[in-house]
Amino acid sequence: MAKKDYYDTLGVPKNASDDDIKKAYRKLAMKHHPDRNQGDKSKVSEEKFKEAKEAYEVLSDENKRMAYDQYGHAGVDPNMRGGGPGAEGFGGFAEAFGDIFGDVFGGQRGGQQRGGRQVYRGGDLSYAMEITLEEAAHGKEAQIRIPSWDDCNTCHGSGAKPGTKVVTCTTCHGHGVVQMRQGFFSVQQTCPQCKGTGKLIPEPCVACHGVGKTKNNKTLEVKIPAGIDDGMRIRSTGNGEPGTNGGPPGDLYIEIRIKKHEIFERDGDDLHCAVPISFTTAALGGEIEVPTLAGKAAIDIPEGTQAAKQFRLRGKGIKGVRSSYPGDLYCHITVETPVKLTEHQRKLLKELDESLKKGGARHSPSEEGWADKLKSFFSA
């Protein structure tokens, strides 16, 4: 019995667009699917479903449709359909709808492919580097040792034992992916047999265990930019783990950790430091030297300076990697109380104390002295 014309089966003209063919098949598949016609003992719906499926498989494929248009049924090789329409049962319904819905949702079918195989980018690596505050401020060049992956010297990168060969995966036929059906959807997944490589290694190389690469170490020159801050990362492109199936390597991220400084604390581009002075300098004033990252600087301490007084030295901080100007240095004054006094020093301090008490509030930095505040509190 002669086969029915595929266009007539779907009810579309010979110049129908791909979208029209999909819509026609979807309509027929929904109408004649056996799950929707379980009471049809004559199997008419089942046969119509198979006919629609066979027609769709040919007309939805550009090459098959071209051959069918030119040579009719004789131009379509049934082996290209995996044994004819009956060999897959009703799976074509899910496959067809998987194609239709795949177009709706962007038609994504797994990762990037190269030569039919799944291509994967290598993983990124991280490396923690500890530097001083001075090195962070001025920048530096350093050498680090990182892992590297080179072609195995025994198998020359093939992964196969010398004298043996790598064979094509029989599960995915070298594509690295297989079609999995889930309900009405057709999903492409990485081949579980070859893990996406498209090939199998019957006898792995004993030196690299079939990987084709061996792990070594290499020295990498790293340039630390001036102004880098704690927690910032430097990316070294292509120095991560190798990719799979010719995929690009990952990157190396060098994370900067700045050692705690004995004098300075960093806050963005600014620096802070505590500057101790004697109580006589605080009272009488004078010039003192303070440290900076570039050397020493002088500060004029006015008489009567109190503890926690802050002095700002503009431009004595750090110029950050994204800054146009350096930050500032903030000097926080602490007043030191003398210890281990001699009898003579004690006598002088007592005399000073008596003199200050007689002066009362006028010697206090506040408008009202502490003694006056207490007197007011207890008399209230």
UniProtKB/Swiss-Prot annotation:
Zn(2+) 2 binds at C169, C172, C191, C194. GO terms for molecular function: ATP binding; heat shock protein binding; unfolded protein binding; zinc ion binding. Binds 2 Zn(2+) ions per monomer. InterPro entries: DnaJ (IPR012724), DnaJ_C (IPR002939), DnaJ_domain (IPR001623), DnaJ_domain_CS (IPR018253), HSP40/DnaJ_pept-bd (IPR008971), HSP_DnaJ_Cys-rich_dom (IPR001305), HSP_DnaJ_Cys-rich_dom_sf (IPR036410), J_dom_sf (IPR036869). Keywords: Chaperone, Cytoplasm, DNA replication, Metal-binding, Repeat, Stress response, Zinc, Zinc-finger. Residues 35-48, 364-380 have a biased composition (Basic and acidic residues). Zn(2+) 1 binds at C152, C155, C205, C208. Its main location: cytoplasm. Its cofactor is Zn(2+). Disulfide bonds: none annotated. Pfam families: DnaJ, DnaJ_C, DnaJ_CXXCXGXG. The keyword Chaperone applies. CXXCXGXG motif repeats lie at residues 152-159, 169-176, 191-198, 205-212. Residues 24-34 have a biased composition (Basic residues). GO terms for cellular component: cytoplasm. Residues 1-48, 357-380 are annotated as: Disordered. A zinc finger (CR-type) spans 139-217. The keyword Cytoplasm applies. Homodimer. The J domain is necessary and sufficient to stimulate DnaK ATPase activity. Zinc center 1 plays an important role in the autonomous, DnaK-independent chaperone activity of DnaJ. Zinc center 2 is essential for interaction with DnaK and for DnaJ activity. Belongs to the DnaJ family. This is Chaperone protein DnaJ. It comes from Polaromonas sp. (strain JS666 / ATCC BAA-500).
